[in-house]
From Swiss-Prot:
Stated role: May play a role in photosystem I and II biogenesis.
InterPro entries xref list: PSII_PsbN
Pfam family, one: PsbN
Compartments, record wording: Plastid, Chloroplast thylakoid membrane
Membrane topology recorded in Swiss-Prot or TrEMBL: Single-pass membrane protein
Organism listed in the record: Trieres chinensis
Transmembrane segments: 4-24
One GO biological process term: photosynthesis
Protein family: Belongs to the PsbN family.
The protein's name: Protein PsbN
Domain of life (superkingdom): Eukaryota
Keyword Transmembrane: yes
Main localisation: plastid
Annotated Gene Ontology cellular component terms: chloroplast thylakoid membrane
Length: 43
């Protein structure tokens, strides 16, 4: 394979991994422990 192809595959995999981890953090089981600043400061 060419070097450019390997770099594109690596960067795409990295971005996909970061996106998947962000979604898991936002909506996964650990999301119950996240605080909601809007609920803390209701007027």
């Amino acid at each position: 394979m060419e070097t450019a192809t390997i770099i594109v595959i690596f960067v795409s995999s990295l971005l996909l991994g970061i996106t998947a981890y962000s979604i898991y953090t936002a909506f996964g089981p650990a999301a119950k422990n996240l605080r909601d600043p809007f609920e803390e400061h209701e007027d």
